């Protein structure tokens, strides 16, 4: 059964959706209630044009683990394909996505000093093979576990913004995102990304998070060769390999020194830019504690 599961995933990613579903069906009795299995089968159902099946699988995965971000991400896509108004309830691209400046970074020299520190950490020659970025580098390890005073100050400023963001959330125990509100948060991951040339992020979500982010620090200048919305954060556009052909729900233009916060279950990526200029960001995932 385990071999069937792995083969099903591989066949699905190769575009052999029907063959993958046959293998998923055969393995299903041994993977009852298994979140990764349910998510992988829901993904394949979307690719096969079976949004009702994807909905049922995603709901089963979410019932098993309410914090399963893939379950919410695939459920959102299933509801969108079905024209179900609950998609807008689950992912509210106006209320749940916020862009606010970090006041400290507006102080003279603060942004430049932070960028200098971060550039010193970007030692890799290319992007990590298991991450969403293409044409750039990502720092190693947890960025906010480093002891540099500039990074410590950034961490404190970010935590204050996250706390304010959570305070603005409605009290809704029935909503998969809002019901996780808590007295505090823990940063489950933190990193910096430096993109150059035609660098970009493919559409993805963050399974280990609750609130995800993009803090833009260096924004490339406009280039006549740029595509529309070059360098922007794109939210709600599903992965191209699913073949759904759905446009973004929201596009956020980057502003140097401003932090964007959004649910970790929202599909997100970036639009490539044409010039050889730098795009420098910090990102993190926050999870509730207490």
Residue ranges and their predicted role:
Residues 88-180, 200:
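Non-heme Fe(II)/2-oxoglutarate
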Residues 156-159, 163-261, 266-290:
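Catalytic core of non-heme Fe(II) oxygenases with the double-stranded beta-helix
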Residues 1, 31-33, 65-67:
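Short coil turns that delineate tetratricopeptide repeat
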């Amino acid at each position: 059964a385990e071999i069937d599961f792995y083969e099903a995933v591989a066949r699905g990613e190769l575009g052999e959706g029907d063959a993958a579903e046959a293998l998923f069906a055969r393995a299903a009795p041994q993977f009852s209630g298994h979140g990764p299995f349910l998510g992988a089968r829901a993904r394949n159902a979307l690719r096969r044009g079976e949004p009702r099946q994807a909905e049922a699988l995603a709901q089963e995965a979410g019932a098993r683990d309410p914090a399963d971000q893939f379950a919410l991400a695939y459920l959102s896509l299933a509801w969108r394909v079905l024209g179900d108004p609950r998609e807008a309830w689950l992912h509210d691209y106006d209320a749940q996505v916020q862009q606010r400046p970090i006041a400290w970074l507006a102080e003279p020299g603060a942004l430049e000093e932070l960028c200098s520190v971060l550039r010193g950490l970007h030692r890799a020659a290319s992007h990590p093979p298991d991450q969403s970025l293409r044409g750039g580098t990502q720092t190693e390890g947890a960025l906010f576990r480093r002891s540099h005073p500039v990074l410590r100050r950034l961490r404190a400023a970010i935590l204050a913004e996250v706390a304010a963001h959570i305070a603005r959330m409605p009290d809704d125990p029935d909503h998969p995102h809002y019901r996780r509100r808590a007295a505090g948060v823990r940063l489950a991951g933190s990193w910096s990304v430096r993109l150059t040339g035609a660098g970009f992020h493919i559409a993805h979500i963050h399974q280990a998070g609750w609130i995800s982010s993009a803090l833009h620090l260096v924004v490339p200048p406009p280039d006549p060769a740029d595509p529309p919305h070059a360098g922007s954060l794109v939210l709600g556009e599903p992965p191209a390999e699913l073949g759904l052909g759905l446009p973004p729900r929201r596009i956020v233009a980057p502003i140097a020194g401003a932090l964007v916060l959004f649910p970790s279950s929202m599909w997100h990526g970036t639009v490539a830019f044409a010039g050889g200029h730098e795009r420098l960001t910090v990102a993190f995932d926050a999870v509730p504690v207490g």
